Amino acid sequence: MITLQRTPLFDVYAKYGGKTIDFGGWELPVQFSSIKEEHEAVRTAAGLFDVSHMGEVEVTGADSLAFLQRVVTNDVSTLKVGGAQYTAMCYENGGTVDDLLIYKRGEEDYLLVINASNIEKDYEWLASHVIGDTKVVNVSNEIAQLAIQGPKAEGILQKVVSEDLKEIKFFKFKNDVLVDGIPALVSRTGYTGEDGFEIYCKSEDAIKIWEKLLEVGEEDSLKPCGLGARDTLRFEATLPLYGQELSKDITPIEAGIGFAVKTNKEADFFGKEVLKEYKENGAPRKLVGIEVIERGIPRTHYPVYVGEEKIGEVTSGTQSPTLKKSIGLALIDVKYAAIDTEVEIEIRKKRVKAVVVPTPFYKRSK
């Protein structure tokens, strides 16, 4: 029997009603109350997520910037201390190793946050391409990560920190913020389409912060949230999930994150030639939104057709809790990607009518 990995918060899941599942080798809560309730809490109030399964890698040394410029697609030279950047790592053929966040903690000190299912693969990829004076260290087991997301997230977190959180702008962070007296890196980032913060602390401090936030957030309807709501929230906001919208066979351009690919940066990086070609002349496939007109919910890998031609497949799909519609993301042949194009999805051996619609499906009002 495979032993599932657990985060430092595992022991408190049951106290809050957490129902765990095997998520890529991790025993994680899929929900605490219900996916729908948790989803709505984040859209209207706030939700607290344990995302400690995510990986963290420290990159330091005099050549750390040159190294990162070679292995990621975005332009890290534009990042200032206290800034965060979304980027991708690619293979030479343009396929995606992973998508990640980079935090610049010092002139020669970067923290990379990578997907849980890719920790070993990413670390080996990074370590195998180290240049000069660069040190790459996997610190995933030492760091826990919590995410507090939703319109009331700032107000709740503000109750337990002395720093003025309004000073931490979107995709910025502060190191050594005291959260209920515990030092943590606090960044204004997230994976839900809402305002919110991600909190990185020592693994042994995670339970104390989790319980304190739920205690002070109770009057503002803060709910503990699981992976189910995390997935429906990120999906509505059209944020890609590695293994579905991104993979070794899907480039960042096709997945709609071309903004994180800077082919005009001086540094040569893995996949640059292919990605430059796709950026300038278009990629053969495109990730599009689809709305099902008839009955049925599109799910990952369901084939998409126009007539008898298979034009691609669904990458993610659900009954949207916010929009109350059956919607999906699909990677399809670019010639069928125009808005309002009618397509068919094969759901349980039956063709169901759908139409290409704009994304993101959900965008919060400022």
Swiss-Prot record:
Belongs to the GcvT family. This is Aminomethyltransferase. GO terms for molecular function: aminomethyltransferase activity; transaminase activity. The lineage of its organism: Bacteria, Bacillati, Bacillota, Bacilli, Bacillales. SUPFAM superfamilies: Aminomethyltransferase beta-barrel domain, Folate-binding domain. Keywords: Aminotransferase, Transferase. It catalyses: N(6)-[(R)-S(8)-aminomethyldihydrolipoyl]-L-lysyl-[protein] + (6S)-5,6,7,8-tetrahydrofolate = N(6)-[(R)-dihydrolipoyl]-L-lysyl-[protein] + (6R)-5,10-methylene-5,6,7,8-tetrahydrofolate + NH4(+). One of its GO terms (cellular component) is cytosol. The glycine cleavage system catalyzes the degradation of glycine. The keyword Cell membrane does not apply. It comes from Bacillus cytotoxicus (strain DSM 22905 / CIP 110041 / 391-98 / NVH 391-98). One of its GO terms (biological process) is glycine decarboxylation via glycine cleavage system.
